[in-house]
Amino acid sequence: MKYSSEFRDKTIAQGLARAIDAEVSSQRAYRFVEFCGGHTHAISRYGLEDLLPANVRMIHGPGCPVCVLPASRIDMAIRLAERPEVILCVYGDLMRAPGSQGQSLLLAKALGAHIRMVYSTLDAIRLAEQTPGREVVFFAIGFETTTPPTAVMIRIAEHKRLEGLSVFCNHVLTPSAMHRILENPKIRNTGGVPIDGFIGPAHVSTIVGTQPYEPMAEQFEKPIVVAGFEPLDVLQAVLMLVRQVNQNRHEVENQYSRAVTREGNRRAKEEVSQVFELREQFEWRGLGLVPNSGLKLKQSYAKFDAETRFAIHDLRVADNPACECCAILRGAKRPIDCKLFGNICTPETPIGACMVSSEGACAAYWTYRRVRDEQARQTS
């Protein structure tokens, strides 16, 4: 089994769609949040919403690390990169993420800031070795999936005594964000619509396992199904959620058992726990300040913390009021509800983070809905 084409089988997908249609009750609505941006793209790419009954609604969640990074953190990174001694190492999908007042790392680079696009933490290590007289700062971002490589990088830097390497840490935690959505009525009732369940993230769950979701499912009485990214994965997860709702169950189920266990990746979690600890709170675009949702370096590794080394402090900046990215990340609105979408906000000229990132909901709508519209025009 190749674990790809088999999970895109059209006949099986149609069978799952019929099963969902047979199980849903016409007397109620079903509203499920797909937390991960990868699921949002799968739903858009394969047109899965078109296969679901009208009373089953998929709500896009804040599962895109570039999208949820607030503009203030981009501004802080730009200030770092403008220092003459600093070389800022950045993953490519961050380069166009919007800061305040139209700023971005790409624009800052064009204006002379020392910014290098990297593909892995190893690139930052090599650069620090090659430029001993400079301060190499790695812009660490992402959920639990990308945190272990950052932890390993810091331990390598300590072992090699790379005094010129530091980390601007923006790693965030998925369970904390899910908890925030469920505990906050203004967020939980997305646009006045309650949430009935979650499709849990795939890649994140390979690291953390399914156990962290269990207290939430019990406390808030909401079913959670961890699912893979293929179309059959998503459809099966929806079917599992529908059955739980119908049976008044609120359990954590693992549809993605071919990659996810209850315990997760113990070695990866150990690497992270050696280097990082919880922040008291961290700001998320769309969710505000979320308690215990971000990571920082432990005191024993504080010498590698760029925020400490360069004495940079949190900023508070307002988002573009015309952009609905914050509401989209909360699930209160969809990309097509934003008046900028497809007009002045496109992948070529993005205004909001949801259009910049390859995992953003706006990027998914733009890419796949345009493709389907074009296909429809060609066949009409």
Curated annotation (Swiss-Prot):
GO molecular function: 4 iron, 4 sulfur cluster binding; carbon monoxide binding; iron ion binding
InterPro entries membership: Hyd_form_HypD, HypD_1, HypD_2_sf
Binding site for Fe cation: C36, C64, C67
Residues in coiled coil: none
GO biological process, one term: protein maturation
Cofactor(s) the protein needs: [4Fe-4S] cluster
Pathway assigned in UniProt: Protein modification; [NiFe] hydrogenase maturation
Record keywords, A-Z: 4Fe-4S, Iron, Iron-sulfur, Metal-binding
Origin: domain of life: Bacteria
Record family assignment: Belongs to the HypD family.
Job description of the protein: Involved in the maturation of [NiFe] hydrogenases. Involved in the biosynthesis of the Fe(CN)(2)CO cofactor.
Name of the featured protein: Hydrogenase maturation factor HypD1
Species this protein is from: Bradyrhizobium diazoefficiens (strain JCM 10833 / BCRC 13528 / IAM 13628 / NBRC 14792 / USDA 110)
Lineage: Bacteria, Pseudomonadati, Pseudomonadota, Alphaproteobacteria, Hyphomicrobiales
